[in-house]
Amino acid sequence: AQFNMSYSMQQVAFLALESVPVILFDYQGVGETEGEARLDNLDKDAGAVWECVKNSDLIKGRKLVLFGQGVGADAALRFYLSHKDQVKGVVLESIYASQKGLIQERHGFILGDLLARTLKETDIQPAQAITLVTCPLVVVNPGKDNFVRKGQRKLFEFSLPKQAEIWNVPGKNYLCVFADNNSPVREKLLDFIKNVD
């Protein structure tokens, strides 16, 4: 299944090879997990995983660098808001301004509006949450992003705090920026993770 933990493995395996501890998990109802996938549960799923691993020998005493893509970036922002003191950096790829806005822009005027009306949004939207991020922050924009459209990207970037870096990556699709073994952005991400405080 696309967008589950096994699909994301190649995008972060290079970090583990560089001795960066990596925690991957499937949200409820995705991959091998049971339950129902819901937007309002994604950050709670991340929190449950964090509670399970934070006292392990490999992790104990370390602060997190959150890395989320698409809906995972939305969840990473909400996780950050309830764990600020445990996070030292945030990296977001293909992040949108609002959940309903993403649906409307992806599916067009009529269908997008109908689908957006049925969506149960979370209490805080990414464009609101991002204004509360105080740690170092990177936003990764694939040049051929087929997940987040330009309107949502611009609305989100308008809300960015001043410490945010934007990495525009020409020629790459959503979920492909870090999957390429020859990607120079991999080194940039590794440098960010190792040097952020």
Tell where the protein language model's regions lie, with residue ranges.
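Hydrolase active-site cap/lid region
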Residues: 75-129, 135, 179
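Membrane-embedded segments
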Residues: 1-52, 62
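Acidic catalytic loop of the alpha/beta-hydrolase fold
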Residues: 144-148, 174-176
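Short alpha-helix in the alpha/beta-hydrolase fold that links the catalytic acid
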Residues: 126, 135, 149-158
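Short beta-strand/loop motif that positions the catalytic acidic residue
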Residues: 132-134, 138-141, 145
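Alpha/beta-hydrolase fold nucleophile elbow
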Residues: 58-70
